[in-house]
A protein has these predicted regions:
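Proteins enriched for Cys/Gly/acidic motifs involved in redox and nucleic-acid/cofactor modification
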Residues: 54-55, 82, 148, 162-190
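N-terminal pre-triad scaffold of radical SAM enzymes
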Residues: 102-112, 180-191
């Protein structure tokens, strides 16, 4: 027997990690090392990403079944309302005999409640899988540890927290939905090196480059709706759609038009560009986002301007993910200033040509980080 020893608050807690080979870097279980476990979870994340833009407001999930260091089957949640990752995996498994010697890796805790599909935890038990590795626990109050508890109660060995941060990050918008009870918000804008988004007068200026444009369309492909203010709608006549990337449906276009000043032509109303919602009246942004999520099922929306709309969401603490494309080679000298926020929170990501990419994302800390009694990867 090999024990993992934790010393906390003056007490020693002993947890048996022998079954999973998590005692030391070179320990083995079934020929698998820590890095092997992480490698299979990385594959789960790769599979999960295939649901990008297709499963919202559900989370993206991937699953891999391994026997003796070999992948037996894979699955992922492919579209909203469709089979969950675990069910897809088992449906494509074929006859491979007893599964008690297999490890099932899944990026998100198996569900334990009836939704559009039956509980995956029950399915796993019915298949007789002996061991399960979970990336991160589900923040959904209807799950939130119940899935792994159900598995453990039936004698399945469960390990939590393999690539936990990566698994949580993949579905950051789902965490917003479940923890804050509202639609998640991505804010994206382009700015010049001297901090301007455009001219004051009603004319367009192209700030970001072609490489950024390709990235923006991939970002749009992953959201449920794109929101702009009425000034941006009237002046820029934006298409607010996805181009150059195959999508199952175009994002909904939302215009915030408090006083009915929008110019809605037949071209703008074309459904081929996506549904158009015009939202007017005295708006409370927090309540609006709750309505978007609870009544309309929008998991995540993208803010694309203008500056006053972006600033209002920032000031209301209703932005969860920020992407700034800063053209380092362009200055306007005057014009519409970029939203005011604490730039110290931003981190530089991969640049696109001359465009610097600065990002920030809301931190949910340890939410979904594991049960107190659970065996965890370190």
């Amino acid at each position: 027997l090999v024990l993992w020893i934790d010393v906390l608050m003056g007490e020693m807690n002993f947890t048996d990690f022998t079954d999973f080979g998590y005692v030391s870097e070179d320990s083995l279980w079934g020929g698998l090392t820590k890095e092997a476990h992480r490698g299979y979870m990385t594959r789960c994340l790769e599979l999960a990403e295939r649901g990008w833009g297709r499963v919202s407001p559900n989370p993206m999930v991937g699953a891999v079944l391994v026997r003796g260091g070999e992948v037996v089957a894979e699955g992922w949640h492919a579209y909203f309302g469709g089979a969950h990752a675990e069910r897809m995996l088992f449906e494509g498994l074929g006859d491979v005999g007893d599964l008690s010697d297999c490890i099932l890796y899944v990026s998100l805790e198996p569900c334990a409640h009836f939704g559009k599909t039956p509980p995956c935890a029950n399915l796993i038990l019915g298949k007789g899988v002996g061991k399960v590795v979970v990336g991160v626990l589900d923040p959904n109050p209807m799950v939130s540890g119940r899935g792994v508890a159900l598995l453990r109660a039936a004698g399945v060995t469960v390990l939590e927290g393999v690539l936990e941060e990566e698994c949580r990050h993949l579905n950051w918008s789902f965490w917003v939905n479940q923890v804050l009870g509202r639609t998640a918000v991505v804010a994206k804008w382009a700015e010049t090196a001297d901090g301007f988004m455009g001219f004051v007068k009603d004319e367009r200026v192209l700030i970001s480059g072609e490489e950024s444009g390709l990235w923006v369309h991939n970002l749009r492909a992953g959201v449920d709706a794109i929101l702009v203010g009425v000034n941006t709608w009237n002046i820029d006549r934006p298409k607010l759609n996805v181009r150059g990337i195959e999508v199952s449906k175009q994002p909904i276009r939302i215009v915030l038009d408090r006083n009915g000043r929008g110019e809605y032509t037949s071209e703008g109303l074309s459904r081929s560009e996506g549904e158009l919602w015009v939202v007017g009246g005295d708006l409370n942004l927090s309540e609006l986002l709750k309505w978007f999520y609870e009544a309309q099922g929008l998991g995540v929306i993208l803010l694309e301007g203008g500056a006053s709309i972006l600033q209002s969401f920032v000031d209301a603490d209703c932005v969860d993910d920020i992407h700034i494309l800063r053209n380092s080679q362009m200055k306007l000298g005057a014009g519409i200033k970029s939203p005011n926020l604490d730039r110290a929170i931003l981190k530089r990501d991969q640049d696109f040509g001359a465009d610097e990419h600065w990002i920030w994302q809301r931190d949910f800390g340890g939410i979904g980080s594991g049960t107190e009694e659970g065996e965890r990867a370190e």
